Amino acid sequence: MSYIDAFYKRDEDKVRVVERDSKGQRKFVDYDARYTFYYPDSRGKHRSIFGEQLQKVQCSTFKQFIKEQKIRSNKKLYEQDINPVFRCLEENYLGKETPKLNVVFFDIEVDFDPQRGYSTTDDPFMPITAITCYLSWSDQLVTLAVPPKTLNMSGAKMATERFENVMLFEKEADMLDAFLTLIDDADILSGWNSEGYDIPYTVGRIQKTLSSDDTRRLCFWGEKPKRRTF
């Protein structure tokens, strides 16, 4: 089993991992977090890279982990800063094959207001009018679009009928809902400047037209997207 991503849930002392099996099916697995550090002790059974004898301390909860470190605050500690995610991956996935990831490359088109100008990710006041996605696992290019105000639905269908995989919608909300369904099995969502514009703008429009909870559909484990600063 190959891992795709992992997430440390400190308040639950769990490491959550997303896997793909040999058939390409995605699975979610929870592991107990392991908290480990070492300290100098002449009776220790472990050695540092410098040859110093070390004693191993392993805890099952973060609270206990902090307590054990405080007890030995007068000693030099080793590996107390290693993320539990990395320990989990080392113990369970070392040597496993790299998975074939399901990747979506996407690009959005946004309406323009002659009075207010272009909208930004901080204030996404204009609707998304089209989304084009490339799905790596099916080798498909799919376009979802809301016809412009100057074109009715029948006219839009005539204009796009010669193109494959074009889906037309009356409302932006319906288009965004279909987009979330379309990318449900994606492991990676990417595109040109997507972190700086397309992803945060899409998140903003989902919040405005659907709901804040619907943004969870973009992430593993039902987490909400977190804005990155550059």
For each of these PLM feature ranges, what is it?
Residues M1-F230:
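The two-metal-ion catalytic cores of nucleic-acid processing enzymes
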